[in-house]
Amino acid sequence: XXGAAAKG
């Protein structure tokens, strides 16, 4: 899974 907040 991936967190949108973690995307830079």
Curated annotation (Swiss-Prot):
It comes from the Eukaryota. Promotes expansion of husk leaf blades. This is Husk leaf blades expansion-promoting protein.
